[in-house]
Regions:
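Catalytic-loop of the protein kinase fold
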Residues: 34, 38-55
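Activation of the activation-loop gatekeeper triad in protein kinase-fold domains
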Residues: 64-69
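Conserved activation segment of eukaryotic-like protein kinases, specifically the C-terminal portion
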Residues: 76-91
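Helical subdomain adjoining the active site within ATP-dependent kinase catalytic cores
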Residues: 115-227
Length: 227
């Protein structure tokens, strides 16, 4: 394997806790990577901080392909179940590798990045530098969404939808019932735009003479892109 000039994701996060914009950019890069994997029907199978590297330009590199799934690999046993704290309880019962193997891990990782961007103090509070997870522990996952970290996330209006999405995923009996990350984020963005549009209409908002409908649409799209 070629040498890659990149940092492990957790190291990158630790180095950028004082730069929330860098962590938000990391979250967007991760979201885009997962979208591309989904489009190709690919799953890594052991998605966690140690298997994701961040290049100096912010692009991501996946390593350790022992549990990889691509289209046409149906029927191959799912022997590597992934790191605890990243895996859905149903993963242990999955017999074969599948395109759905990463759905829960992706949601956990994205939520962790977004949460640390908003609340960097959690890094020291939970001594995350010394853990084998990024934010959620195995006990957090086993709690079904009732642990302290879930309460903290749901107290933040910008990211509470992610905590609720994890809780909803934990209620699902199998990985194929979990909503893909890009659909969760898009659903939230669409909701934000819809609510803003309703507020503007209810307040009889009138754009200035120099604003076109395209300008307004672009403003809404920019707001949505931040989610």
């Amino acid at each position: 394997m070629d040498w890659v000039d990149a940092k492990p994701m957790k190291k990158y996060i630790a180095d950028n806790l004082s730069r929330p914009s860098a962590l938000e950019s990391l979250a967007r890069a991760f979201l885009e990577m997962t979208r591309e994997l989904h489009e190709q029907g690919i799953s890594h199978g052991d998605l966690q901080h140690g298997n994701i590297l961040v290049r100096p330009d912010g692009s991501l590199v996946l390593v350790d392909y022992d549990s990889l799934y691509v289209l046409g690999m149906d029927g191959i046993p799912d022997d590597i179940k992934g790191l605890q704290g990243y895996q859905h309880p149903a993963r242990i019962h999955q017999r074969y590798r599948s395109a759905y193997s990463d759905f829960f891990s992706e949601l956990v990782i994205y939520t962790s990045i977004r949460t640390l961007a908003k609340h960097p103090g959690l890094w020291n509070k939970y001594s995350l530098a010394d853990t084998e997870t990024m934010l959620f522990t195995e006990k957090d996952i086993q709690s079904g969404g009732t642990s302290e970290i879930f309460r903290l996330i749901e107290s933040d209006r910008d990211i509470r939808y992610l905590g609720r999405a994890i809780k909803d995923a934990l209620r699902q009996p199998s990985l194929d019932r979990i909503v893909p990350l890009q659909d969760i984020v898009k659903g939230q963005a669409d909701s934000v735009v819809e609510n803003l549009s309703k507020q503007w209409l209810s307040q009889s908002y009138q754009p200035s003479a120099f604003q076109s409908n395209i300008d307004i649409f672009n403003q809404l799209a920019e707001i949505a892109s931040r989610w």
